[in-house]
């Protein structure tokens, strides 16, 4: 079944303006470090990101050394963006 984000997700989070850019960032970001390596099942990673987004988190911290192995967190998050969040990008 396709993922459908919570309609009230932006009401659940405080957002702060980033300088004069007009960009708003959530008060809480989600770091995808050891919980997004190849040793974590894809369904678990998918559930983490979906829940965070449903709570209004729109900023996800990634780095090329997150894993293990290094880079696997970026690959996993990219796959979730492609499959679950294409309609919200």
Where are the predicted features?
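N-terminal binding-site loop/beta-alpha segment at the start of enzyme catalytic domains
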Residues: 1-89
